[in-house]
């Protein structure tokens, strides 16, 4: 007996967007997640203009702060690039997940408070803890347990230091309508306006240290922030996660579970939305094999730009000059930002 056309494992943004696209395609859809909502995690919380447009097409309109563009600064050099095709949006992760969840319920998606554990794919479908579907979309996060159980993990490069992300909010009015990226010797701090009196600060680094200690690398930023945060510190990592394939029979990976390079470019939600749409197209066409090609195409720009910037970040000669080079070549910086914003 078939319980659904598609079971989605994970009720984060990638999983819920997949469920919404599936419902729109007329597929019976079931979402499994045992975590209580709203689900929070370490996240830069900045939506690129392309992500804002994709969410609107799904009928999802989260409240947040308009973002006009991106600023890079290293304390001496500053370079800005404004989005050309509409604003981005700074929005709390919990707000985004809650709005997506409500929209999924309205669309007729069945939501079950249960963690997908016993996954058994076969030639005709997938059984998940006794529930049966034609396909399974795996959206259970960066360190996907299902991906690991199915043997789809690839070993990462051990010669490069792993990178980690941490995030905390501060009760202070945003001082700009740009996402500010502050560069230090071994880390970056992303400041995103997420409310009229609230900013989120996400630090990416190859150094593991308490959040307050991480902020010491950014003295100009630290002067603007209250001594105490307005939320608890959330962390994630190692960020680099590689997979052998996004398709294993009738099991398809989406979101961070499908593989992740780094959060340097802040494009995660936009890529997840594009890949969720591609996944549903392939499921609706009963052609899961096409998803690997569609995923590679949808994520190519993100993977190329992020990998290139990460490579530069790891070069002792280039790393201290990234912002100064961007400031001397503002048209190149602007072009890169427009590519990410698309």
Predicted regions and their residues:
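A conserved beta-strand/loop capping segment in the N-terminal third of enzymes
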Residues: 52-101
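Glycine-rich FAD pyrophosphate-binding loop
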Residues: 7, 20-43
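Predominantly flavin-linked oxidoreductase catalytic cores and closely associated redox partners
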Residues: 103-227
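FAD/FMN-dependent oxidoreductases across multiple families
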Residues: 118, 161, 207-280
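C-terminal helical "tail/cap" subdomain of flavin- and related membrane-associated enzymes
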Residues: 281-342
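Redox-cofactor binding/interface segments in oxidoreductases and associated redox assembly factors
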Residues: 9, 138-139, 253
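Conserved N-terminal glycine-rich FAD pyrophosphate-binding loop of Rossmann-like flavoproteins
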Residues: 35-58
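Beta1/beta-strand and adjacent pyrophosphate-binding region of the FAD-binding site
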Residues: 1-14
């Amino acid at each position: 007996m078939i319980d659904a056309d598609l079971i989605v494992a994970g009720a984060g943004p990638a999983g819920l967007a997949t469920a919404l696209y599936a419902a729109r395609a007329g597929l019976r859809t079931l979402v499994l997640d045992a975590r209580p909502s709203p689900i929070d995690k370490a996240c830069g919380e900045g939506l690129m203009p392309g992500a804002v447009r994709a969410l609107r097409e799904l009928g999802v309109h989260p409240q947040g702060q308009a973002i006009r563009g991106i600023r890079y600064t290293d304390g001496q050099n500053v370079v800005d690039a404004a989005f050309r095709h509409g604003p981005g949006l700074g929005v709390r992760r919990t707000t985004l997940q809650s709005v997506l969840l409500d929209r999924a319920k309205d669309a007729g998606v069945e939501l079950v408070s249960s963690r997908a554990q016993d996954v058994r794919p076969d030639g005709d479908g997938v059984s998940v803890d006794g529930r049966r579907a034609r396909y399974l979309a795996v959206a259970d996060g960066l360190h996907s347990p299902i991906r690991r159980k199915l043997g789809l993990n690839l070993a990462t490069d051990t010669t490069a230091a792993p990178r980690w992300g941490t995030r905390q909010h501060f009760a202070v009015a945003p001082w700009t309508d740009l996402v500010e990226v502050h560069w230090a010797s071994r880390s970056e701090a992303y400041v995103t306006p997420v409310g009229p009196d609230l900013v989120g600060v996400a630090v990416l680094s190859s150094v593991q240290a308490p959040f307050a200690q991480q902020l010491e690398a950014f003295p100009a930023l630290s002067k603007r922030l209250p001594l105490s945060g307005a939320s608890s510190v959330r962390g994630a990592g190692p960020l680099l996660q590689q997979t052998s394939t996004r398709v294993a029979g009738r099991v398809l990976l989406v979101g961070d579970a499908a593989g992740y390079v780094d959060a340097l470019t802040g494009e995660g939600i936009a890529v997840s939305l594009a890949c969720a749409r591609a996944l549903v197209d392939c499921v609706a066409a009963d052609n899961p094999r096409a998803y690997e090609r569609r995923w590679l195409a949808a994520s190519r720009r993100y993977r190329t730009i992020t990998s290139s910037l990460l490579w530069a970040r790891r070069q002792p000669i280039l790393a201290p000059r990234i912002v100064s080079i961007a400031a001397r070549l503002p048209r190149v910086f602007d072009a890169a930002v427009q590519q990410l914003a698309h």
